[in-house]
Amino acid sequence: MALPASMRLRGHRCFNRLHRIGRRHHGDWMVLRVMPEEPRLLRPELRRHPTRCCRCALVISSKVSKRAVRRNRLRRLLHQHLRQQLEHRGDLAGRWVLISLRPEASEAEPSQLLEECDSLLSSAGLGQ
């Protein structure tokens, strides 16, 4: 299940800012970047809607897997997990989260990816 629109982070300016100044948390299979939100970087139609939770994005490049089917499965798995973990956490409103999978992530079991995601969220102060 995909992230709801209110939780999605979109736009190249947001991604560029997260890459430049976001606080990084490294794992074996992914990198998590977190920063306070900057609404001026969002598109005008998204600025009007206040966020009830943090906004999240996933980056899964073709280096992870050449097969789009595999990348989409990983994306759906992590979207569902992020939704379950963060959707009802109002205390996290005002933060942006970017998760980038490393090429080695394709060799990991789904349970290992979810465990690492949880540990990175906890180290970033977003865990439960």
From Swiss-Prot:
Show the catalytic activity.
Endonucleolytic cleavage of RNA, removing 5'-extranucleotides from tRNA precursor
Question: Where is it found, in Gene Ontology cellular component terms?
Answer: ribonuclease P complex
User: Which biological process annotations from GO are given for this protein?
Assistant: tRNA 5'-leader removal
Q: What class of enzyme is it?
A: hydrolase
Under Enzyme Commission nomenclature, its number is 3.1.26.5
- What's one Pfam family the UniProt record gives for this protein? Ribonuclease_P
Q: Which InterPro entries match?
A: Ribosomal_Su5_D2-typ_SF, Ribsml_uS5_D2-typ_fold_subgr, RNase_P
Q: What are the alphabetically sorted keywords of the record?
A: Endonuclease, Hydrolase, Nuclease, RNA-binding, tRNA processing
Q: Which HAMAP family match?
A: RNase_P
Functionally, this protein is described as follows: RNaseP catalyzes the removal of the 5'-leader sequence from pre-tRNA to produce the mature 5'-terminus. It can also cleave other RNA substrates such as 4.5S RNA. The protein component plays an auxiliary but essential role in vivo by binding to the 5'-leader sequence and broadening the substrate specificity of the ribozyme.
The name under which this protein is listed is Ribonuclease P protein component
- Give the organism the record lists: Parasynechococcus marenigrum (strain WH8102)
- Identify the gene encoding this protein: rnpA
